Curated annotation (Swiss-Prot):
EC number of this enzyme: 1.14.13.29
InterPro entries in UniProt: Acyl-CoA_Oxase/DH_mid-dom_sf, AcylCo_DH-like_C, AcylCoA_DH/oxidase_NM_dom_sf, HpaB/PvcC, HpaB/PvcC/4-BUDH, HpaB/PvcC/4-BUDH_C, HpaB/PvcC/4-BUDH_N
pH dependence comment: Optimum pH is 8.
GO BP field: 4-nitrophenol catabolic process
Name of this protein: 4-nitrophenol 2-monooxygenase, oxygenase component
Natural source organism: Rhodococcus sp
Enzyme class, spelled out: oxidoreductase
Amino acid sequence: MTTSAFVDDRVGVPNDVRPMTGDEYLESLRDGREVYFRGERVDDVTTHPAFRNSARSVARMYDALHQPEQEGVLAVPTDTGNGGFTHPFFKTARSADDLVLSRDAIVAWQREVYGWLGRSPDYKASFLGTLGANADFYGPYRDNALRWYKHAQERMLYLNHAIVNPPIDRDKPADETADVCVHVVEETDAGLIVSGAKVVATGSAITNANFIAHYGLLRKKEYGLIFTVPMDSPGLKLFCRTSYEMNAAVMGTPFDYPLSSRFDENDAIMVFDRVLVPWENVFAYDTDTANGFVMKSGFLSRFMFHGCARLAVKLDFIAGCVMKGVEMTGSAGFRGVQMQIGEILNWRDMFWGLSDAMAKSPEQWVNGAVQPNLNYGLAYRTFMGVGYPRVKEIIQQVLGSGLIYLNSHASDWANPAMRPYLDQYVRGSNGVAAIDRVQLLKLLWDAVGTEFGGRHELYERNYGGDHEAVRFQTLFAYQATGQDLALKGFAEQCMSEYDVDGWTRPDLIGNDDLRIVRG
C-alpha cells in the first residue's frame, strides 16, 4: 500500500481523491505484504480462505459509503477543501451535533456487519480524526500529523493499531527488553530503522497500514516512537493466529457458522525486522510525547466512543436473536426467562444511553474541537467487561441445551434418510420448522459457544484495558479534573449542617426540648 498513490498534498485544492470502493479496497491489499499462516506465506489475503470473506465484509462497508441513501449519514463533505466526502468520524468534531453525526455513522457502518467488527476502518478514526485539531501535540512532526489527517480523511484508509508489547518479561520496563519491544536500531536520512514486535495486531492482515504507539512508561528515546507503517513495508511480518473463518469453511457452511465465516478479525503477532519508517510517517521520537499519548492525543475518549456505539449495535443483534430463540424453544412466557431477557435489554439500553451521553455532553478540547465525554466513556469501558460476559451467561441459561441440540452440518438436510427425523424431532415450538430453528440456534452458538464466540468475549473484556486499570483510571480522571473534590465537598456540605451541639443550619429547629439524655 503506497499512500502517495492515493493523495494530493495540497490543502484546500480540489482533487479527485475519494474514499475507496469495495473493489478498490480489495485491490489495495494485493501489495505483496508478508503474512504468514500455517507455515506458509500468504500470496493474496483477498483470495486465501483464512481471510477472504472477512476482507469482503470490510469491502461491503466501503461500498456502503457510495450508496446515495447514505449521503448525510455515512458520507459528509470533507473539511480539507478537496471537494470530496468522508465518514464523519474522520473529521474534527466541533459540537455535540458533530459527535451525534459521528455516532450515527459508526452505527450505520456497524449495522452492515451486525456489530461484529470491532476494528472496522472507522475505529482508527478515533486517532486520525484528532490530528487536524491536535497537530501541535506532535511538535516537530506537526506537518506529518496534518498530512495524515488529510490523507486518511479523503481516501478513508483502513488502519489498525498495535500499541501493546508482547507479554514477555512484563515485570521489566519495555526499554529493558530490547530483543522484544519495538525500538530504533538506526537513524538514516530516509527515516528510522525499527526492530521489535507488537501485539495484538487485530485485523492487520487486511488493513492498509498500522499505527504504532506505546502504552506505559518509557525512559529511553529509541523506544519513544509513534508512527504509521504501510503493510507492504519491507521487513514487516505478520504471524497470524488460527483462522476461525477457515475453520468454519472446512468444518461447516455459512448455515453452520454464519459469523465465524465472515467476521473473523484475525489477530496477529507483528514483527519489525529492520523496517524503514520514512520521516514523513513519524509522529513522535521522544519519550515525553510517547508517554503522554494516551491522555493527551485525544484518542482515549474517541476510541471509547466508537466502542460503545459498536457494542450497542452488537447487543441489538444479540437481543433480537435471543428473543427469537426463547420463542422457538417455547420458554418465552416463563417469568424467569422474561426477567433475564429484560436484563439483556437493560444492558443494551445502558450502552445506547452512554453513547448518547458521550456525544451530547461533550468536553471542550483544543483549537475549538470537542471530545466525547470522558467520564461516560470510562463508565462504558468498565461495564463492557461486565455486561458482555453477563449477556453471554444469560444466553446459556435461557437456551441451555438448545444451543447444542442441533444436527452436525447443513448437508444433513439433503439426506432423505435423515430429513424426516430432523423435521419431527428438531423442530421448534409454535409451528417453527426444524430447519429454521437450527439456523437461528447455530447463529447463537457461533456468537457465544464457538472459538469465534470465545474470542469475542475475551475482546470485550480486555480490549479497553485490563480489569483493574479501567477502574482505577476512572478515579485518576476524577482527581485530575478536580471532580473528586466536588464530590467530597458535597459530602462535607452535608456534614457542615450539624455538629455535636446540634443543627448549624438556622432553618432547622433544635431538639433540646425532646432529648432524653441531657448534658
